Amino acid sequence: MKRTPLFYVVLAIILSSCARPVANFTLEGETQVLSPIVFDNQSENATAYEWDFGDGNTSERAEPSHTYRQSGNYTISLKAINEKGKARVTEKAISIAPPAICLVEIKTIHGSMLVELYDATPQHQDNFVKLVQEGYYDGLLFHRVIENFMIQGGDPKSKDAPAGQALGSGGPGYTIPAEFVDSLVHIKGAIAAARTGDAVNPQKRSSGSQFYIVHGRNVTEQDLAQLEAQKGFRYTTRQKEAYLEHGGTPFLDRDYTVFGQVVEGFEVLDKLAAVPTDPRDRPKEDLKMKIRLIR
C-alpha cells in the first residue's frame, strides 16, 4: 500500500499529540543571597509551566528569574504541562550562599528596606545585629518622622504606645561609644545612631537601640563648603558627588555615628517620610517595624 505525504503528516500530528511533556531546566547566575538567578527552560512538548523555588515562592512564567533572600539549601521543581493536561516534573537542588556583607531587612506597612551594616563601625554593627536576633525591634515604631530630614525609631517604649504618648527617651539601658569614620556620611538612606545632646553627652555616645534613617534634602556645593569651614574637615570628591546627587543631612556629620546605608527600598523611605504627623512629629498612623538579619 502506497503511503501519501498526507499520511505522514497525519501520523506526525497523532504522534505529537500523544507525546508526553519533558521537564528540564538549567540556571544561570551567582548562587548567593540577593543575586538574581535566571532559569533557562529546556522543556519539550509543554504549553504551561509551574515553578516552585523551594522558599515559598512560585511562578508560571516560561523562563522566570528569582532572588533568594536567605541562604540555605533549596529544592527547585518545574512542572511542564502539555495542552492535554499531561505533566512531568523535574527537581534540582541548589545551595544559596550567605551575602558577602552584613545585611538586614526592615519591614513596614509601606514596604521593606534593605540595609547594609558597615564593618567599619563594629560596635554598632554587633549591637544592632544582637538586638535584631533577639527580636528587640519587632513591633516598635518609627516614632519620629520629619520629611526631608529623617525617620527615627527603636524606642522600646513605643511598642503598643497609645496615641499622644511622648516617645524617644527609651533604650536598652546602655549606650555605645561613638564610632566616627571619615568615609561614612549622612547621605540619603544613611542609618545612624540617635543620642542625647552634647550638654549631657559630650562624648557623643550613641543610644543602645534608637536609630534614624536619613531622608534629607537637596545639598549644594555652597552648603558643603560652609560646613567644611565650620567643622574643620574636608569632604572627598566622592562624598561631594554623593551629596549633590542624592542629598542628605551633612550638618550631622562627625556628630552622630553613621553605621549603615539603605541599599534597596528608597521608595519605601520616601513613603515613610511623607506620612502625616502630629505636633510632636509622631506619625498619626503607627509605623511598626520588623527587622531580620539576611544570612
Language-model-detected regions and their locations in the chain:
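A ubiquitous, low-specificity "background" feature that marks scattered single residues
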Residues: 8-10, 47, 216
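Cyclophilin-like peptidyl-prolyl cis-trans isomerases
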Residues: 18-20, 32-38, 44, 65, ...
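Surface-exposed, flexible coil segments in extracellular/virion-facing regions
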Residues: 48-66
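Bacterial Sec-dependent N-terminal signal peptides
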Residues: 1-26
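Surface-exposed, proline-enriched loop/turn segments that connect beta strands in immunoglobulin-like
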Residues: 24-28, 53-54
